Amino acid sequence: MSKTPSKTGQKIEQAFEKALDPFATALKRATRTPGATTPAEPAPAGKPGLTISPLAVPFPAIAPVGGVEIATARAGFYKHERDDLVVFRFARGTSCAGVFTRHKIGSAPVDWCKKHLAGPDGGKDVRALVVNAGCANAFTGKAGADAARRTASEVAKRFGCRQRDVMLASTGVIGVVLDDKKIAAKLHEVEQGLDADAHPSNQWARAAVGIMTTDTFPKGSHAEAEIEGYKVRIAGVAKGSGMIAPDMATMLAFIVTDADIHPNVLQALLGLHVRTTFNSVTVDGDTSTNDTALLFATGTSGAPRIGRVGDRRLKSFSAALDKVMLDLFLIN
């Protein structure tokens, strides 16, 4: 026989409802984003045999973002028939910011990115991002670090940039050294894909699928904002299955905008919104070695450059970035 809740119990229930309401509202928004009801292309599961989550939403039709090209290939890291290598190529002068795991022993790609984003010149001219799924290259010591360096070197030669201008990310089995030769062998195919298809409509969907591991559906989001009357676009993809926070789980998130924003400002924005999205919930309490969230600004929109953290012109952009990150967080 049910009992009528006490006044204290009613207050607790009301507090929970109030706390959960923003999440419920945001989830509705994420699933009702204009254009999100039509998938860009069929969304296969990350791992054959897994039941697709009942919370799965169609992958949105994401408009091209200026200054970035994306290509995928099957390098053979993932044991199933699926692309497992994703490469982003960015315009010259692209800014980059990153947030990473707080695990005391980060993976080789995490250490690489943290090293080259640090310092006064860090993140000022990032030209590429290379992501592989199936091998985490974590707990691999010097051999793993050397494999990461060789990967960046090969990509830098292809794209005519410095090694430090290539960001890396990996997800998958821990304790196995990355076979960088598999990536090198696919770079010609990747480069052809980058050159052949200028902003294909499904490039973001392919990228989202290419970074999945145990995910049951690809995750993406997009938004638009204004900076002094110029329209700027933001788009992103994420992976993580039962894994949410960059400092407390296993996730990758990559977001690109065509706004022109200094790396220091980009870092401040990413740090601000990570706290209220990716870092606000954990599922299993485990700390991962590979958590990575990277934000890139290509500067191709024509909007004026933002070089100060407190610039009021960032208001619309900051809100749009929060929307994209919240969407990726909620559908993870």
Predicted features along the sequence, with ranges:
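N-terminal amphipathic/basic leader segments beginning at the initiator methionine
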Residues: 2-105
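Glycine-rich, charged/polar anion/phosphate-binding loops
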Residues: 65-75, 95-96, 219-223, 231, ...
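Residues in well-ordered beta-strands of folded domains
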Residues: 71, 86-88, 111-113, 132, ...
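Catalytic cores of large soluble enzymes that bind and process phosphate-bearing ligands
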Residues: 77-80, 98, 102, 140-147, ...
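Glycine-rich phosphate/pyrophosphate-binding loop regions near the starts of catalytic domains
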Residues: 85-150, 158, 167, 243-268
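Short, surface-exposed loop/turn segments at secondary-structure boundaries that line and modulate
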Residues: 129, 133-142, 164-185, 282-305
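Glycine-rich, mobile lid/loop segments that gate access to catalytic sites or pores
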Residues: 149-278, 288
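A glycine- and small/hydrophobic-rich beta-loop-beta segment
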Residues: 298-332
